[in-house]
A protein has these predicted regions:
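Short internal beta-strands
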Residues: 40, 146-149, 174-180
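N-terminal phosphate/diphosphate-binding loop that engages ATP/GTP or pyrophosphate donors
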Residues: 4-6, 20-96, 100, 107-108
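Hydrophobic anchor at the beta1->P-loop junction of P-loop NTPases
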Residues: 9
Length: 238
């Protein structure tokens, strides 16, 4: 592990475990002595907590992993209310998703923390506005990329296409994680081995399905215990 520990986490799709992996990475980096914080350029989907405060479960997970108090610091410049494609919800809420604003927010955080884990939204090519997509932002940030593969039917094609897209932007793939979704897929280990044979980047580990006691309820972040469980099954990039 180098003295710099900054990563951009993307996934083969939405709901494949990017937040779980991002939180686990933050936990492991902080355990290794880094002053690490999580960041998301945009989120879509909010709920009201028991105190009537608007929250987003992904941001709350990153906050918990980063060891921050509620409302201590902003981890995202754009918080949209409806859980749908960010560019569509931004249009619906009359918001322009500006990559410059996202980069400025990221840079402000980087002045306070020596290690950033940036979690993307959805997949790698998700549009942000009429001109830019998430890949453009990742290219501008230029952090090594960690790919989360949600292990389900079709994931091999999705993973290999995403790797091609990442490499076409001249970005380094620091590693990839196999995340077992709630129902284990048939031939799970064989699928993981196929991906290991075809993805020319380090395999960081496979996260099994979370035990029932650690599964998060709807409209809630992952618990620190769930992040610790996931962290036990992955390695940090070297």
């Amino acid at each position: 592990m180098s003295s710099s520990a900054n990563f951009f986490v993307t996934g083969t799709d939405t709901e494949v475990g990017k937040t779980l992996v991002s939180g686990a990475l933050i936990f492991k980096l902080r355990e290794s002595g880094f002053n690490t914080v999580g960041f998301k350029p945009v989120v879509a989907g909010t709920y009201l907590d028991v105190n009537g405060v608007k929250q987003n479960e992904d941001l709350e997970t990153l906050r918990i992993a980063s060891g921050l108090e509620p409302q201590q610091i902003s981890l995202c410049p754009y918080v949209l209310d409806v859980p749908a494609a960010p560019h569509l919800m931004a249009q619906n809420e009359s918001v322009h998703l500006d990559c410059g604003v996202m980069l400025e927010a990221k840079n402000d955080l980087h002045k306070q923390f020596n290690s950033l884990v940036i979690e993307g939204a959805g997949g790698f090519l998700v549009p942000l506005n009429e001109e830019d997509d998430l890949a453009d932002l990742a290219q501008a940030i230029d952090f090594p990329v960690i790919l989360v593969v949600g292990m389900r039917l079709g994931c091999i094609n999705h993973a290999l296409l995403t790797c091609e897209a990442i490499q076409s932007r001249q970005l380094t793939i620091a590693g990839w994680v196999a995340n077992t979704l709630s129902v284990e897929m048939p031939f799970l280990q064989e699928n993981i081995q196929t991906l290991q044979d075809r993805i020319f980047a380090p395999f960081l580990g496979a996260i099994p399905s979370l035990p029932k006691a650690l599964m998060k309820p709807r409209n809630a972040p992952y618990s620190l215990e769930a992040l610790k469980f996931a962290a036990q099954h992955i390695n940090l990039p070297k």
